[in-house]
Regions:
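Short linear motifs at protein or domain termini
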Residues: 1-102, 213-225
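Short helix-capping and inter-helix turn/linker motifs at the boundaries of alpha-helical repeat units
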Residues: 11, 109-110, 173-177
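Anionic, Ser/Thr-rich low-complexity intrinsically disordered regions
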Residues: 25, 138, 158, 175-178, ...
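Small-residue-rich midsections of specific transmembrane alpha-helices
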Residues: 67-68, 169, 176
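Conserved amphipathic alpha-helical segments that form helical-bundle/coiled-coil interaction surfaces
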Residues: 85, 106-167, 180-188, 196-207
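Short helix-capping/hinge motifs at transmembrane helix termini and TM-loop junctions
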Residues: 101-102, 147, 171-172
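Short amphipathic alpha-helical interaction/hinge segments
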Residues: 162-173, 209-216, 220
């Protein structure tokens, strides 16, 4: 498990929640992995109580499952939840990128350009683990530009399930066409071309639907039946 330092003024519960969630999404903690409050508390250097609170919070998001007498496990990936997350993203991302075409300014373009340029740099250097966070930041920036940041926060919990498949897609299928997708989306926004931008979003999201079949054939143990 990858463990980062606590942020200034970050309480123990939020620290445990952040570390656990990041490791689940990055697949450092693989689906089906048994987790122990005692071991996690020792690794994080905190007491069991904040770890327990973090586990409860992640259980509400269906990322951890706890069973009496059996313990807690990282949830297997649920294809139904992934598809529902993709459904919501298709609707909201399409509407939001069209709004971003109207709202875009030089500052917004600079933010998106810096992000995509970094993605392309890391891809060229084989540092693909760096792309995950930049991917999230890219899409969040589009919501911010469209002035729909609250919408992004509201659906972020369900998106966690989509994000696990997204990260597994890159790790398993080795398909980095998503970086080119981001470049093309940026250029459509720059041109204020709503039709092309919306089409690119749908193509981008459909890419993971195609990948899922390949992923499940290679990692069937990660998925619910």
């Amino acid at each position: 498990m990858k463990i980062d330092n606590k942020f200034p003024r970050e309480n123990a519960r939020d620290y445990a929640l952040r570390i656990l969630k990041n490791n689940i999404l990055s697949l450092e903690l693989k689906p089906g992995t048994v987790i122990s409050e005692n071991e996690l508390a020792t690794e994080l250097g905190i007491s069991r109580t904040p770890v327990r609170e973090a586990i409860i919070e992640l259980s509400k998001a269906y990322l951890i499952e706890t069973y009496p007498q059996r313990g807690s496990f990282i949830s297997l990936i649920d294809p139904k939840m992934v598809e529902e997350a993709r459904f919501i993203r298709r609707i909201t991302d399409t509407a939001v990128i069209e709004l971003a075409c109207d709202e875009i300014d030089e500052e917004g373009l600079a933010i998106l350009e810096d992000n995509v340029t970094l993605q392309e740099f890391y891809l060229s250097k084989g540092m693909t683990d760096k792309i995950f966070d930049l991917d999230n930041q890219f899409h969040k920036s589009i919501y911010d530009i469209a002035k729909k940041d609250i919408v992004y926060e509201i659906h972020s919990t369900l998106m966690l399930h989509f994000d696990r498949v997204r990260n597994l897609s890159v790790a398993t299928v080795k398909d980095f066409k998503v970086v080119a997708d981001h470049r093309n989306m940026l250029e459509a926004i720059r041109k204020k071309d709503k039709k092309t931008a919306a089409e690119l979003v749908n193509k981008h999201l459909n890419r993971y639907q195609i990948d899922e079949k390949e992923i499940r054939s290679q990692r069937p143990e990660y998925f619910k039946a």
